[in-house]
From Swiss-Prot:
It is found in: Cytoplasm. Gene3D superfamilies: DnaJ domain, Tetratricopeptide repeat domain. Pfam families: DnaJ, TPR_11, TPR_2, TPR_8. PANTHER family: DNAJ HOMOLOG SUBFAMILY C MEMBER 7, DNAJ PROTEIN P58IPK HOMOLOG. One of its GO terms (biological process) is protein refolding. This is DnaJ homolog subfamily C member 7 homolog. Its main location: cytoplasm. TPR repeats lie at residues 23-56, 59-92, 143-176, 177-210, 223-256, 261-294, 295-328. GO terms for cellular component: cytosol. Transmembrane segments: none annotated. InterPro entries: DnaJ_domain (IPR001623), J_dom_sf (IPR036869), TPR-like_helical_dom_sf (IPR011990), TPR_2 (IPR013105), TPR_rpt (IPR019734). PROSITE patterns: DNAJ_2, TPR, TPR_REGION.
Amino acid sequence: MTEVETTHMNAGTESQQEPAELAEKQKAIGNAFYKEKKYAEAIKAYTEAIDLGSDSALAIYYSNRAATYMQIGEFELALCDAKQSDRIKPDVPKTQSRIRQAYEGLSILNEAEVYLKNKQAGLALNALDRLQRRIDSTTQPPMSWMYLKAQVYIFQNDMDRAQKIAHDVLRLNPKNVEALVLRGKVMYYSGENAKAITHFQEALKLDPDCTTAKTLFKQVRKLENTKNQGNDLFRQGNYQDAYEKYSEALQIDPDNKETVAKLYMNRATVLLRLKRPEEALSDSDNALAIDSSYLKGLKVRAKAHEALEKWEEAVRDVQSAIELDASDANLRQELRRLQLELKKSKRKDHYKILGVSKEATDIEIKKAYRKLALVYHPDKNAGNLEAEARFKEVGEAYTILSDPESRRRFDSGVDLEPGMEGGAGMDPFDILRAYQAGGSFPGGGFPGGGFPGGSYNSQGFGMGGGFPGFTSFQFS
């Protein structure tokens, strides 16, 4: 601990003796308070000594008050007093040391502010810890330090610690404007915008010229209004305009991680409605990068993965959601559904084989089959084993999807075990012959006993001029 000076200065003339003696008494009182670590009382006593003391004694009084300011972290006030002491009595080693220490403290404080401005939170906290070690451990640091540390915690999204600092200050002084602004900022960055607005309004009642409160009040209202406009547009089914509103809101305050996560999640939901699942996945990833335990974000990302048929990822997201909320029966039902889709994805996908969507009509399925059967038929691919395999695959897919009951069972996932899919072993040439026969094949054939369009060129492709036993086929 910095020691105060106790040297007694001799009084001058008799007219100066009485105030000088009073000044010395105040200095002694200040020294006693200093030793008891009652720094506020010590500062008051030294101030009275300065007001009463003679010029020859002022150097010690200023130096002692500087030492006291140092103990509570008021380095700027300490520097002013130490410099004043040095002007009155230059080159005193103890005074020079206090000037140096005050400059060092101010330099570290400036470091912390620069680090925070550059978003280097870890370095900012390190600087503040170094400052803390320079003052008496029993004293509360200056409000400016506490406010700065709370700012760092907000940047780190550690709202509990930031909230505690604001609470501690307001407990001591409920009308502290800086603390009200700080607590409002914590509320704001915790996503509690209504409470934040209340705190900023209270701060502005106490200090209408508080620039920080004014700026934050306007910002939170703008962000909240823009977000709500997006929500209203979404409820109205106006998804493109909702997307644009959420995008606008995301630009207002990128540092408000809590609200930004919600906005990303909202925009991801809109993107799913707009059939843009890749972008929805990116937005939900961004939301979860901010908060990995964001339940709604996990649900939305699971939907994005589902839309992209990334079943394993969708299952993992729902499992993570269940870990966060094990009581949600809907989540467990969703997990079972996605696990079934995952199993279905590991079997042969007849829709993909035919190149049609799962919503394809019977006519679309038949057209797709005809086109692929022409491409891979052995007449066109003599000796090509890969084409022969694809030809069989196409026939098998058509066998399943052209029959309503088989298709229903396939879609529902009933037939997941090998060998359970109806018609799986049917000869692909029999499928073609069904067209010629006029529709004995499950699900019916094309009108007129074959593909639309008339007769097949008898010159054919190698195997006797065309498909075996099939004469009414035309390539397109």
